[in-house]
């Protein structure tokens, strides 16, 4: 009663306040305070997160589906969209972050080294172009594949914008759905159907070269390789049966789409993604069984797609590593073996056996992967240096490093290394300028027979491309950024579906990075997936657990 009288005196009331009226006043004050707090959170703290989600949706959902009526304009069309929209989002993000500075302690960024290396890479790109006086060809990339300075800065800005937010589970579902739509459209095109009129203005015989809204079949397959692990992560690590079935269905469609591209990089990348998901699935036998089933489905995708392509009206040709494995029936054999291992994991789990720990499983499998890689490199060195006369047949295209290695990639790699060796010290350090590779390599095109498919405006190796255009500084930042992102995601992934999927995606990107060109859709997707993983880490750190289960 003493406290009540004090409150009444403060309000200068003459009539005593009842207990019920006092409680009503307290509740009303608390409700108003809560409403004000929520409104402030939406207007200030949540605004950067909203812009981050919009940017991620644009880069990973809208951009792959953007399409122009002429196939040869796909690159330029997507690049122009990025260069128009991302700067506006960056301006909004900067304004929102200034408004959100309330003096409260911010959540520290888990990937600080990754962000610094990205910044260093962008600085290296600017320096390389500054040495040319910011020539227009270096800004818009018109002499290459349109990965000029402006586009690279926009992709870097998108990386920082997406990484500043907190990825939600619904966004992940939307990304997977959009990637599945791209894969379905590519499968329809590969089977000889053209529902959207893609081939109306294309030359006869080139229908098998372009698939879906991505364009060239090589980039179509490698794009799906980067998105396949996000769906696979849902199947392997999700605790909800519905999400597991959703993830498996989408992953199977994307695996078939990747095999429809008929490329070595898509085939290798798909299996690298499955291997990475299996390597980090330790600690739970059912989870390991899911990873083995996913890998088995990926193995079955090659023979299934090869049979389906036989009925296509366009009659696409299968060559290289996919044809070799199809003729050997390796996909069917590996599928049966993996399904048997998955059944063994389920049987052991029902008998109460424990799975090996996550760290031990990852250490053993990644060690085996490292030994297999060293063995492959040693075999290549042996047949390239020691036993150069042995007839290897079709295997020579990837076991003997010469001008014909990797569908003429060896020719571009060797000339790129010669050009770098002949460059001056300043150019070696800072590069010749973005997308000026053709100028650098043209004096070294000494074998006209190797140019029957066209000249090389890219050495078909992204680190080599960065070495020629951005110098040692740019290449070192690019490679270290990849390594830092991979280590960060592996260290924090645990059994979070999105983080594990992002790790597998970055791990599979290694083959894309080594044997593919620096293509706009690949760079944009790669940087965005890396940022998606970092934003998921921020969300995990703020909530203290897995946050990517819708």
Predicted feature descriptions by range:
Residues 216, 407-455, 470-474:
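TM-adjacent membrane-interface loops and short helices in multi-pass inner/ER membrane proteins
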Residues 72-78, 139-144, 217-218, 262-269, ...:
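Membrane-interface catalytic loops of GT-C/OST-like multi-pass glycosylation enzymes that act
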Residues 74-83, 109-112, 143-144, 323-332:
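Interfacial loop-to-helix junctions that mark the boundaries of transmembrane helices
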């Amino acid at each position: 009663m003493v406290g009540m009288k004090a409150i009444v005196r403060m309000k200068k009331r003459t009539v005593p306040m009842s207990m019920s009226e006092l409680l009503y006043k307290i509740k009303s004050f608390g409700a108003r305070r809560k409403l004000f707090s929520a409104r402030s959170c939406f207007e200030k703290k949540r605004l950067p997160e909203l812009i981050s989600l919009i940017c991620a949706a644009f880069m990973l959902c809208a951009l792959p589906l953007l399409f122009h009526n002429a196939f040869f304009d796909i690159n330029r069309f997507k690049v122009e969209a990025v260069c128009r929209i991302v700067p506006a989002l960056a301006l909004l993000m900067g304004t929102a972050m200034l408004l959100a500075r309330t003096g409260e302690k911010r959540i520290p960024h888990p990937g600080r080294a990754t962000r610094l290396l990205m910044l260093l890479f962008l600085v290296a790109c600017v320096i390389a172009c500054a040495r040319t006086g910011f020539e227009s060809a270096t800004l818009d990339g018109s002499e290459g594949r349109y990965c000029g300075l402006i586009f690279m800065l926009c992709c870097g800005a998108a990386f920082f914008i997406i990484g500043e937010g907190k990825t939600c589970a619904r966004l992940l579902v939307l990304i997977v759905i959009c990637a599945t739509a791209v894969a379905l459209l590519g499968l329809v095109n590969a089977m000889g159907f053209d529902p959207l009129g893609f081939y109306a203005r294309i030359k006869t015989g080139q229908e098998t070269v372009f698939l879906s809204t991505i364009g060239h079949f090589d980039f179509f397959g490698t794009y799906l390789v980067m998105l396949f692990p996000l769906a696979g992560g849902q199947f392997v690590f999700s605790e909800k049966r519905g999400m597991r079935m959703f993830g498996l269905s989408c992953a199977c469609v994307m695996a078939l789409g990747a095999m429809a591209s008929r490329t070595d990089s898509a085939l290798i990348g798909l299996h690298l993604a499955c291997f990475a998901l299996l390597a980090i699935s330790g600690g739970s036998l059912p989870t390991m069984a899911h990873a083995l089933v996913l890998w088995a489905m990926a193995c079955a995708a090659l023979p299934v797609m090869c049979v389906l392509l036989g009925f296509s009206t366009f009659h696409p040709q299968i060559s290289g590593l996919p044809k070799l494995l199809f003729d050997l029936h390796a996909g069917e054999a590996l599928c049966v073996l993996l399904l048997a291992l998955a059944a063994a994991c389920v049987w052991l789990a029902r008998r109460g056996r424990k799975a090996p720990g996550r760290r031990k499983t990852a250490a053993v499998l990644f060690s085996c992967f490292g030994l297999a890689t060293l063995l492959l490199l040693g075999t290549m060195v042996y047949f390239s240096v020691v036993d150069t006369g042995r007839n290897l047949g079709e295997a020579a295209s990837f076991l003997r490093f010469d001008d014909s290695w990797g569908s003429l990639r060896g020719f571009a790699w060797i000339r790129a290394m010669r050009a770098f060796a002949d460059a001056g010290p300043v150019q070696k350090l800072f590069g010749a300028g973005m997308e000026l590779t053709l100028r650098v390599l043209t004096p070294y095109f000494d074998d006209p027979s190797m140019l029957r498919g066209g000249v090389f405006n890219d050495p078909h190796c992204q680190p080599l491309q960065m070495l020629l255009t951005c110098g040692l500084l740019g290449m070192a930042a690019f490679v270290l950024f990849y390594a830092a992102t991979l280590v960060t995601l592996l260290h924090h992934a645990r059994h979070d579906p999105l983080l594990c999927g992002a790790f597998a995606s970055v791990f599979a990107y290694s083959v894309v990075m080594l044997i593919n060109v620096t293509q706009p859709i690949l760079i944009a997707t790669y940087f965005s997936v890396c940022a998606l993983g970092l934003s998921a880490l921020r969300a995990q750190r703020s909530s203290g657990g897995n946050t990517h289960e819708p």
